[in-house]
């Protein structure tokens, strides 16, 4: 259902307020670059520091600006099941085509708790839903066996697998078959994960290089394996640079350096250190981004 190069879009701020004009411009930059779908209010969109009104407004702006040209997949995850249901329902009402739900963080549920959480949302809201497994951030790993149980529900259509583990992604693919799509959640392994059977990537790098990320994915699905492999290697350095500090600090810094929006992040995220910013500038110059 959702495939290809999918951007986890940044939320631009201006003096502490969501910059709606710049957000619309960033959406246009993505569509012009061949991006296949857009995720507002994900990790990269600083969803955890948006208030409810801002969260809904960001989704609304992206849905309006996209105007059905590509799917919009709203980040609606929470560590409260009731809140996740409410946010997913709001996203549906705002016109989102799907929802991306991170595993409940901090409270460290068991696999049974994770299963019941996702099933509760899937039962409550008739909207295509993508599981989001990122244990490095959440403190809990959604295991392949649990994914296989969840894949039986018609509203659970995909998983963003961001463990960085090809083994775990492969186990999900082996257990679930065609009952659920796998999307890569780590830019630096998009190509090998697609080789295992993933249908695309939810990308951070696409915020600054949408054409190139789309070129990698498009080459792969066109059967041009050598071209895709070359894109994988070309993009490796910038992919790594996007994570030299906590996401989305590097990518927002990059967006700022390119003059596309402010590099402003919200506390407790802090501006990039000078040392890392200099490293990022050096890499971006190699790619002729600045």
Swiss-Prot record:
GO biological process per UniProt: diaminopimelate biosynthetic process; lysine biosynthetic process via diaminopimelate
Pathway assigned in UniProt: Amino-acid biosynthesis; L-lysine biosynthesis via DAP pathway; (S)-tetrahydrodipicolinate from L-aspartate: step 3/4
CDD domains hit by this protein: DHDPS
Organism domain of life: Bacteria
Reactions performed catalytically: L-aspartate 4-semialdehyde + pyruvate = (2S,4S)-4-hydroxy-2,3,4,5-tetrahydrodipicolinate + H2O + H(+)
Keyword Lyase: yes
Xref: Pfam families: DHDPS
Keywords of the record: Amino-acid biosynthesis, Cytoplasm, Diaminopimelate biosynthesis, Lyase, Lysine biosynthesis, Schiff base
Site positions per UniProt: Part of a proton relay during catalysis: 43, 106
One Gene Ontology molecular-function label: 4-hydroxy-tetrahydrodipicolinate synthase activity
EC number: 4.3.3.7
GO cellular component: cytosol
Binding locations of pyruvate: 44, 202
Residues at the active site: 132 (proton donor/acceptor), 160 (schiff-base intermediate with substrate)
Keyword ATP-binding: no
Gene3D superfamilies the record matches: Aldolase class I
Cell location: Cytoplasm
Assembly with partners or alone: Homotetramer; dimer of dimers.
Main function: Catalyzes the condensation of (S)-aspartate-beta-semialdehyde [(S)-ASA] and pyruvate to 4-hydroxy-tetrahydrodipicolinate (HTPA).
Family per record: Belongs to the DapA family.
NCBIfam families per record: dapA (TIGR00674)
Protein name listed in UniProt: 4-hydroxy-tetrahydrodipicolinate synthase
Species this chain originates from: Geotalea daltonii (strain DSM 22248 / JCM 15807 / FRC-32)
Gene that specifies this protein: dapA
């Amino acid at each position: 259902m959702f495939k290809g190069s999918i951007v986890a879009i940044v939320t631009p701020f201006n003096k502490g307020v969501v910059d709606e004009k710049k957000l619309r411009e960033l959406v246009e930059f993505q569509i012009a670059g061949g991006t296949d779908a857009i995720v507002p209010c994900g990790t990269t969109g600083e969803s955890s520091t948006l208030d409810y009104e801002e969260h809904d407004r960001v989704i609304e702006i992206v849905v309006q600006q996209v105007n059905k040209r590509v799917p919009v997949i709203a980040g609606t995850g929470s560590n409260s099941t009731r809140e996740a249901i409410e946010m997913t329902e709001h996203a549906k009402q705002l016109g989102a085509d799907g929802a991306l739900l991170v595993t409940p963080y901090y409270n460290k549920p068991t696999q049974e708790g994770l299963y019941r959480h996702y099933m509760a949302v899937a039962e409550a809201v008739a909207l295509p839903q993508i599981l989001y497994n990122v244990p490095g951030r959440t403190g809990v790993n959604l295991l392949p066996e649990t994914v296989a149980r969840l894949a039986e529900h018609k509203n659970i259509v995909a998983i963003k697998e961001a463990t960085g583990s090809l083994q775990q992604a492969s186990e999900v693919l082996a257990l679930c078959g065609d009952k659920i799509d796998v999307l890569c959640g780590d830019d630096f392994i998009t190509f090998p994960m697609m080789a295992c059977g993933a249908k695309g990537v939810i990308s951070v790098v696409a915020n600054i290089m949408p054409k190139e990320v789309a070129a990698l994915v498009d080459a792969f699905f066109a059967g041009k394996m050598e071209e895709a492999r070359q894109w994988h290697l070309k993009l490796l350095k910038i992919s790594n640079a996007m994570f030299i500090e906590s996401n989305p600090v590097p990518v927002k810094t990059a967006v700022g350096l390119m003059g596309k929006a402010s590099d402003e992040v919200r506390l407790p995220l802090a501006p990039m250190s000078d040392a890392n910013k200099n490293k990022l500038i050096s890499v971006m110059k190699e790619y002729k981004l600045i």
